[in-house]
Amino acid sequence: LTDASIGYYVDLVPQGLDATQTQALLGFLAYDRATWEAYRKMDGDLSAVEASTTGEELESYRENYRKSQAAGEREVGTARMVVSSVEMQSGSEAVVDACADQTQIKRVSSNGEEIPKPSWQHKYSYLATVRLVDGAWKVASLQETRRLIQRASRLQLLRRSEHL
């Protein structure tokens, strides 16, 4: 699942999934990896994204990709993913509860200069609806559930001060 050659790491997936849940999970991870790789390469090839995404989510991705492409931007760094659950809604739909860590991703211009920290560069949790479409599990929608506070050291200091 992890591919260090492209800086894509899957740190945790749930254990004990049945065959259908596993296929839905693999469909979700195919989407996540494809979108990361497309933003890294920025070569216009969205075939892997199109194979793992459907509906409004695919259109939304294409629009955001075109904006980045027109601006001459691409991404470098490391993407990390944790999946906490895969809940079947029916035989052809699942909801994947995931957490993405994008804090080690940088957006760079065509000449390699870092673009100031984008607003999306954070850790966040979201629910992905994955549907079985023409024999393949594809991401149909993403719903961000919460952003995780990036001030871990500050929180640790606060906790330490509470114990003094």
Range-by-range predicted roles:
Residues D45, V49-S52, A70, A79-V82, ...:
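Short, surface-exposed, charged/polar-biased interaction segments
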Residues D3-E75:
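Core segments of small alpha/beta cavity-forming domains
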Residues A94-A136, T145-L164:
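Exposed beta-sheet edge and beta->alpha loop/turn motif
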Residues L1, S5-Y9, M88, L158:
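Extended hydrophobic/Leu-rich segments
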